């Protein structure tokens, strides 16, 4: 049996990289199979006046950043990063031996939208659902009915769920803005949906300012629930720094740890 190199976490963002460039980079890196993630994000959330005021108030309270400039940066990030389910499915269809596609749904939108996106992911034959509480502006415990719908779908259709855990660029580097991506928020779902593999992207650790921010919370969840998996995309220090390596070995082992690059972001 030939061991294959799998990159579990790749963003084929069309505004950043073309299909041709992505294929070339995957080949150059010696990757046999890449898992491509859709990203259902946009700035509509910030167009609601009340939401916008709340956001700016929090920005002033928690941070000394220039909040209006920060708002523009966030809008730019969201508009740039949008990657549709259809686009990812097209790349997979064009390169079936090289790519596996994972869809995305924004749970901060209404229930009928969530149901529509689940149908779309099913029809496109995608391997699972990617959720990103930071860029999608949702609290996993406050959107319980929508998240349960997504988990029930994945349970029934035998699909995976990938959840971003840790901070994110710009304002989301401030932990106060990234609390929704703390792995501790997912205990309810890990316990209720034991047959759904839940992958904690970045192992709770992604943060330039506070590396390893919720590493312990991620391990805690993984120790308790065998359906919790991890990827180490964008957090290579978890594989090289002794204190992290030892703790992973001791507390959860390596069988549920997946390699990912987060390329090209």
PLM segments and residue spans:
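An N-terminally biased module of ancient metal coordination in phosphate/nucleic-acid-related enzymes
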Residues: 1-80
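Active-site beta-loop-alpha junctions enriched in small/polar residues
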Residues: 9-13, 39-41, 104-108, 132-136, ...
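Short, acidic/polar
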Residues: 15-26, 109-121, 215
């Amino acid at each position: 049996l030939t061991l294959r190199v799998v990159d579990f976490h790749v963003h084929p963002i069309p505004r950043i990289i073309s299909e041709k460039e992505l294929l070339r980079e995957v080949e150059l890196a010696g990757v046999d199979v890449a898992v491509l993630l859709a990203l259902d994000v946009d700035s509509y959330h910030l167009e609601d006046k009340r939401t916008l005021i709340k956001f700016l108030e929090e920005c002033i309270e928690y941070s000394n950043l220039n909040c209006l400039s920060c708002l523009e940066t966030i809008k730019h990030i969201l508009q740039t990063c949008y990657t549709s389910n259809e686009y990812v499915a097209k790349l997979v269809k064009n390169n079936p031996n090289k790519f596996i596609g994972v869809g995305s749904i924004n749970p901060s939108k209404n229930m009928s939208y969530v149901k529509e996106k689940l149908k779309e992911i099913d029809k496109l034959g995608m391997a699972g659902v990617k959720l990103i509480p930071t860029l999608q502006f949702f609290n996993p415990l406050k959107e319980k009915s929508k998240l349960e719908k997504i988990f029930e779908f994945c349970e029934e259709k035998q699909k995976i769920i990938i959840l971003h855990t840790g901070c994110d660029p710009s304002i989301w580097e401030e932990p106060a803005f990234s609390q929704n991506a703390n792995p501790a928020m997912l205990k309810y779902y890990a316990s209720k949906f034991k047959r759904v593999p839940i992958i904690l992207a970045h192992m709770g650790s992604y943060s330039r300012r506070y590396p390893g921010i919720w590493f312990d919370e991620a391990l805690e969840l993984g120790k308790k629930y065998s359906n919790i998996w991890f990827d180490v995309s964008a957090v290579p220090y978890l594989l090289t720094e002794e204190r992290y390596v030892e703790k992973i070995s001791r507390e959860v082992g390596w069988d549920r740890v997946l390699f990912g690059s987060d390329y090209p972001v």
